[in-house]
Regions:
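A residue-level marker of the well-folded mature domains of exported/periplasmic proteins
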Residues: 1-182
Length: 182
């Protein structure tokens, strides 16, 4: 899969920090805020656990964790509240690329380094407005889901319904498009 702006993917295994680099990061005394689109499921809890564990190993203090309940206006409010604490890093999944863009822009302009998961705000340029976007191979997940569905339906086939999620969410569209194409 390509990224939201057509970026070529890189596996997480390509990111390796030396002991010296980790020591420098720890010396920074950096802080992070985790601004989720939704936190009420196993996937979000697993992501949060992974982020908190890795930040702790790197000496980065997590000063805030929010759950917008998939409401853009709540996420904007969360970002505004968090910025009063001046985090060095914000890891986030934007609920709506357009409705949240100004709040993310304000956070970046205030000096927070932005790392996105799965979705980016409208008009944001990689490497300029944000550090990175991380995601699974969602197109590949859609292909795999289609093959699993075909196997479950058996050789005689059958009918299945595919529900389109109308929210402007990059990775959901990737999975949907891949499932349909397969």
């Amino acid at each position: 899969s390509k990224g939201p702006s057509g970026e070529d993917p890189s596996p997480a295994s390509d990111v390796v920090l030396t002991d010296e680099e980790l020591a420098k990061i720890k010396e920074m005394g950096a802080t992070a805020a985790i601004v989720f689109h939704y936190g009420g499921n196993d996937w979000s809890r697993a992501q949060l656990n992974g982020l908190q564990t890795q930040f702790a190993a790197m000496g980065i203090e997590v000063i805030a964790v929010t759950d917008a309940g998939f409401k853009p206006e709540k996420q904007v409010s969360d970002l505004e509240t968090i910025m009063a604490q001046s985090p060095d890093i914000i890891v986030s999944i934007p609920t709506d690329p357009t409705a949240t863009a100004a709040a993310y822009r304000a956070a970046a302009e205030a000096g927070a380094k932005l790392v996105f998961m799965d979705n980016i705000p409208a008009g944001f340029v990689p490497g300029k407005d944000y550090v990175s976007v991380v995601s699974a191979d969602n197109y590949g997940n859609g292909v795999a889901a289609a093959h699993l569905m075909a196997k479950a339906l058996g050789p005689d086939g059958g009918e299945s319904g595919l529900v389109f999620h109308a929210a402007d969410f990059f990775v959901t569209k990737q999975r949907y498009d891949a499932f349909k194409a397969t």
